[in-house]
């Protein structure tokens, strides 16, 4: 199968992560995966949800949205509709779970970290790009808090990233574009840590059921892609 952008089945799209993209947040990046572009920012509040008061534990939560011009047809803002749509709710919960999985909140104190992921151009894989980019913004933010003496150490247990895999025209592909996603028989999103532990697997047969062997193949391919993304994260942060 020849992919639209001439990639092999096992290739990621070109990935670029620009740090310190905005002036005001504690951490911010623009992540570009092919034609998908997401701005990820990190802010902090000196308080925690009621269920954490008095525990000396921190918290992290996320919001996700798509700008009106991010899709071929104008996307109506959620605020105009009066409610967050189900897809956005699902994705922002996924982003929050993915990042909470690698943060040691006992070292944050009673503070809440806010992750905001805003899609400025959508061409497939916005949720996985948001997770991968938000981690870099989070690392930068925590490093700044440490530098300012607000926290004693960066409370990151390990790196985390995410990627999509799927089956299109009977072939297993890594990092689906929007065109491929629309034609996919199987669509899957995988979130994994640097040590190879899964945070989340979201997989659905859109048209044709898939076998156990195909599932294993997709998970192995996703792992390869995620390890490459973590390498890119580290290089972006100057750790490699």
Swiss-Prot record:
For the ligand (phosphate), the binding residues are 87, 125-127
InterPro entries per the UniProt record, alphabetical: ExoRNase_PH_dom1 (IPR001247), ExoRNase_PH_dom2 (IPR015847), ExoRNase_PH_dom2_sf (IPR036345), PNPase/RNase_PH_dom_sf (IPR027408), Ribosomal_Su5_D2-typ_SF (IPR020568), RNase_PH (IPR050080), RNase_PH_bac-type (IPR002381), RNase_PH_CS (IPR018336)
PROSITE patterns per UniProt: RIBONUCLEASE_PH
- Enzyme superclass (EC): transferase
Mind listing the GO biological process terms from this record? Answer: rRNA catabolic process; rRNA processing; tRNA processing
> Which reaction is the catalytic activity of this chain?
tRNA(n+1) + phosphate = tRNA(n) + a ribonucleoside 5'-diphosphate
The GO terms describing molecular function are: 3'-5'-RNA exonuclease activity; RNA binding; tRNA binding; tRNA nucleotidyltransferase activity
EC identifiers of the protein: 2.7.7.56
Signal peptide interval: none
What are the entry keywords?
Nucleotidyltransferase, RNA-binding, rRNA processing, Transferase, tRNA processing, tRNA-binding
Highest taxon listed in the record's lineage: Bacteria
What NCBIfam families is this protein classified in?
A: RNasePH
Which proteins does it associate with, and in what oligomeric form?
Homohexameric ring arranged as a trimer of dimers.
The free-text function statement in the UniProt record for this protein reads: Phosphorolytic 3'-5' exoribonuclease that plays an important role in tRNA 3'-end maturation. Removes nucleotide residues following the 3'-CCA terminus of tRNAs; can also add nucleotides to the ends of RNA molecules by using nucleoside diphosphates as substrates, but this may not be physiologically important. Probably plays a role in initiation of 16S rRNA degradation (leading to ribosome degradation) during starvation.
| Family membership | Belongs to the RNase PH family.
This chain's protein is named Ribonuclease PH
């Amino acid at each position: 199968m020849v992919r639209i952008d001439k990639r092999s089945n096992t290739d990621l799209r070109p990935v670029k992560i620009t740090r310190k993209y905005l002036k005001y947040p504690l951490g911010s990046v623009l992540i570009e995966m092919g034609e998908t572009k997401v701005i990820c920012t990190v802010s902090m509040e000196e308080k925690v949800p009621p269920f954490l008061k008095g525990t000396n534990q921190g918290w992290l939560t996320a919001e996700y949205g798509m700008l009106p011009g991010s899709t071929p047809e104008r996307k109506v803002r959620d605020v105009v509709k009066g409610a967050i749509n189900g897809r956005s709710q699902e994705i922002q919960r996924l982003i929050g779970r993915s990042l909470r999985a690698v943060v040691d909140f006992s070292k944050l104190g009673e503070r809440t970290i806010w992750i905001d992921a805003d899609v400025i151009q959508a061409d497939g894989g916005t949720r996985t790009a948001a997770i991968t980019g938000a981690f870099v913004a989070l690392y930068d933010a925590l490093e700044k808090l440490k530098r300012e003496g607000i926290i004693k150490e960066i409370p990151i247990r390990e790196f985390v990233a995410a990627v999509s895999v799927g089956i299109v025209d009977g072939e297993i592909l890594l990092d689906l574009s929007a065109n491929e996603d629309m034609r996919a028989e199987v669509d899957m999103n995988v979130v994994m840590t640097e040590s190879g532990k899964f945070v989340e697997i979201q997989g659905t047969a859109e048209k044709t059921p898939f076998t156990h062997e195909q599932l294993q193949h997709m998970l192995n391919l996703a792992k390869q892609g995620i390890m490459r993304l973590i390498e890119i994260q580290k290089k972006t942060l100057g750790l490699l």
